């Protein structure tokens, strides 16, 4: 099942990744881990095919240093990364994605969050393979309450998945899983992955 553990600091842990990879489930690892911790867990068997490092608005030099460090210390290559910020529409964000795509053409890139087809278009044109969709619908997300910005999750999934298909990409539904059936609804709306955990 294409489920991805959320990159929240109490969910996207190395321990979670080790447990989930046994079932071929992916894990967006929290961005609060240091390089040496990554090396330690990769050497313990953390599979980089299922466990993706998360970045925010880091400079390309930080991403380059991380990928090079992991390869040098573990003999394993980072296969996918997740870019995660609350507002995926800002210019600086799309610029970082473009720089990363240019530097690492074979790397899988998932970026977000957005809730509109225009946001999907922006991030996919910048080089993302997948786009995280969801603002304000997460179990502990207070974006809608504090900023007034948000969008119903199912509606966002439907609209954004249609746009992603135009670029041969996919969306990751991020948020809105609260009751029985929400995961199924996300897949029915066209999501390639459903991110869960809060």
Where on the chain are the PLM-derived regions?
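Active-site capping/gating regions of soluble enzymes
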Residues: 170-198
């Amino acid at each position: 099942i294409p489920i991805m553990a959320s990159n929240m600091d109490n969910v996207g842990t190395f321990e979670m990744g080790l447990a989930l990879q046994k079932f071929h489930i992916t894990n967006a690892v929290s961005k609060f881990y240091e390089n040496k911790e990554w090396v330690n867990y990769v050497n313990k068997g953390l599979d980089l095919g299922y466990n993706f490092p998360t970045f925010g608005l880091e400079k390309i030099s930080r991403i380059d240093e991380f990928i090079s460090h992991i390869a040098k210390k573990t003999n394993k290559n980072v296969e996918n990364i997740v870019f995660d910020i609350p507002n995926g529409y800002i210019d600086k964000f799309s610029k970082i994605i473009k720089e990363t795509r240019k530097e690492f053409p074979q790397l899988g890139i998932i970026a977000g969050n957005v809730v509109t087809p225009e946001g999907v278009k922006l991030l996919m044109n910048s080089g993302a393979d997948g786009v995280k969709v969801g603002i304000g619908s997460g179990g502990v997300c207070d974006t809608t309450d504090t900023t007034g910005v948000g969008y119903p999750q199912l509606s966002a999934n439907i609209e954004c998945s249609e746009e992603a298909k135009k670029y041969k990409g996919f969306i990751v539904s991020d948020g809105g899983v609260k009751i029985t059936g929400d995961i199924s609804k996300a897949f029915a709306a066209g999501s390639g992955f459903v991110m869960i955990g809060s």
